[in-house]
Regions:
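A non-catalytic, amphipathic alpha-helix used as a structural packing/dimerization or gating element
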Residues: 130, 134, 161, 165-172, ...
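Non-catalytic, usually N-terminal nucleic-acid engagement modules in DNA/RNA processing proteins
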Residues: 1-183, 300-303
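Glycine-rich phosphate/ribose-binding loops and adjacent secondary-structure elements
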Residues: 164, 176, 180, 185-309
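Glycine- and acidic
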Residues: 152-156, 160, 220-227, 335-338
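Conserved, mostly hydrophobic/aromatic
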Residues: 25, 58, 93, 135, ...
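C-terminal extensions of enzymes
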Residues: 1-22, 27-34, 42-43, 147-153, ...
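Catalytic cores of large soluble enzymes that bind and process phosphate-bearing ligands
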Residues: 123, 127, 158, 165, ...
């Protein structure tokens, strides 16, 4: 069973600092969670995730792990923690977003989500019940309820229909979760996902419905269906609608977000947990996030820059390698370039939430955030 305690609140915003306790260790919030979709954070050794990046919790994805390596392998391995040799907390998404974004053929009904594999075209179905069973076999500490990720530009009628489907699935998912047990000797908790697209009344209805199902097995609440095509200001507006309605004694997780500025703005609105592929995916393409802004390491301006990769960075790679050297590696399409950039970006994202936490505790988060955000968005 997970437990969340809030240790500090910002007096000028909804930001808060907390501790999320799981059987695989504590997570200090606000936190960023590196995405390890198929049991691996792309381009990073676990050694570096632990000692350099200082990741406290990572993600896995049910859709990908269900398809490959498959549930038989994961069960024989004793779950994902043992399979990938990671003894800190893991969170798994239900796979709903991946069905929405990857599956070439999909059909959503009250029964569940029928889809074809993007790997070999084979046919599958996720129901709320078998999705619980699948995530029990994977064995993450925190599991997400099955939902439909509604497109950001959906009209009200579609969004309302989508929410009704998600609510029906949530009722069955929560009931089956409560009737089943973890498989590997440690506890698991589940987060309902609050949907509703960009419509405040739908978000409010989603929270009201989810809270009717609240009990000790609901370790927190996720806010989904944002950063999927809607304007950024709409995302912030939906957080302002949703977060105040959620329990104060449970963590809030904003799924799939986002840029460093998005994360700080999310913290200011009461979010505790974040994940995003941006630091890894953009890093592989030469984009580095820093306190001074965003660097494109493919740009010729770095050709003769022999200064450290990031003088303000805390990662090993930041002081060990020069900008000129990493620029060369990207131009030469060396695999190592992507590894260095990924390590830097993930370390920066973890630094970002760590420093944000320090300012929440110190009581000056909002002025600090307001001063930092414009710099984070600059192009260097």
């Amino acid at each position: 069973m997970s437990h969340f305690s809030c240790i500090a609140r910002d007096s000028q915003s909804a930001a808060r600092a907390g501790v999320l306790a799981t059987d695989h260790g504590e997570v200090l919030t606000p936190i960023f969670m590196p995405v390890g979709t198929v049991g691996s954070v792309k381009g990073v050794y676990h050694r570096d995730l632990l000692s350099d990046i200082k990741a406290q919790i990572i993600l896995g994805n049910t859709y990908h792990l269900y398809l490959r390596p498959g549930l038989d392998t994961l069960r024989k391995a004793g779950g994902l923690h043992k399979f990938e040799h990671w003894d800190r907390p893991i969170l798994t998404d239900s796979g709903g977003f991946q069905v929405f974004s990857l599956a070439p053929i999909r059909k959503l009904t009250e029964e569940g989500c029928k889809f074809s594999s993007h790997i070999d075209g084979s046919k599958h179905i996720f129901t709320p019940e078998n999705n619980v069973d699948t995530q029990r076999i994977i064995g993450a500490d925190i599991i997400m309820a099955l939902d439909e990720c509604c497109p950001g530009d959906a009209d009200y009628r579609y969004a309302a229909k989508s929410l009704k489907l998600t609510q029906g699935w949530l009722e069955r998912f929560a009931a089956h979760f409560d009737q089943t047990e973890p498989l590997y000797g440690y506890s698991q908790t589940m987060f309902p996902i609050i949907q509703g697209c960009v419509y405040p009344d739908l978000r409010e209805k989603a929270v009201e419905h989810a809270l009717k199902l609240d009990n000790e097995n609901r370790g927190g609440y996720a806010v989904g269906g944002l950063a999927v095509g809607e304007p950024t200001e709409k995302m912030y507006e939906m957080l302002e609608v949703t977060c105040p309605l959620l329990p104060q004694d449970k963590p809030r997780y904003l799924m799939g977000v986002g840029t460093p500025a998005n994360i700080l703005e999310g913290i200011a609105r009461g979010i505790d947990m974040f994940d995003c592929v941006m630091p890894t995916r953009n890093g592989r393409n030469g984009m580095l996030f820093t306190w001074d802004g965003v660097m494109n390491m493919r740009n010729a301006k770095w050709t003769d820059d022999f200064g450290p990769l990031d003088p303000l960075g805390t990662s090993f790679v930041d002081s060990y390698y020069t900008r000129a050297y990493i620029h060369l590696l990207f131009i030469a399409k060396e695999m190592f370039a992507a590894m260095v950039a990924t390590e830097h970006n993930l370390a920066f994202y973890l630094d970002l939430v760590r420093v944000a936490r320090e300012h929440i505790v110190a009581g000056d988060f909002l002025p600090w955030k307001n001063a930092v955000v414009p710099k984070l968005m600059q192009r260097l």
